[in-house]
Amino acid sequence: MNPIHLVLIGPPGVGKGTQAVLLEERLGARPLSSGVIFRQEIEAETDLGRLANSYIKRGELVPNGITIEMMAKRLRSDEVRRRGFVLDGFPRTIRQADALEELLAEMDVKLDKVISLEIDPEVVVSRLAGRLGCTKCGEIYHAANK
């Protein structure tokens, strides 16, 4: 089977990560969450991770250039080229979308689908209010589920 290439977009708390895992189980495509990749790069103390962390610690968004570079590194990996991908949380901006388009053209990869997930704003607030993160592994979960 040919690798599939998907992008999931939607607000935080809509379930992009959950759907990415389900799509991996069904289609074999590698979920790539920008948040997870940030945490991994920070934990590994890479140059990009340290740079990203300097913004995160100040409560600022990580600049497009750093985000794009981190995601490009993963998208170019042998595993992702072999399995395909489900992007979660990337692209978030027009600049990131343009960079993704350029990168995929360079890799001779075409997106199969962009899926927009929608949710009632009140549900988003409820989900995010109960969202917690494990300090050891970085997993994000809802207080009601653990």
Model-derived regions: residue spans:
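Glycine-rich phosphate-binding loop of ATP-dependent small-molecule kinases
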Residues: 1-146
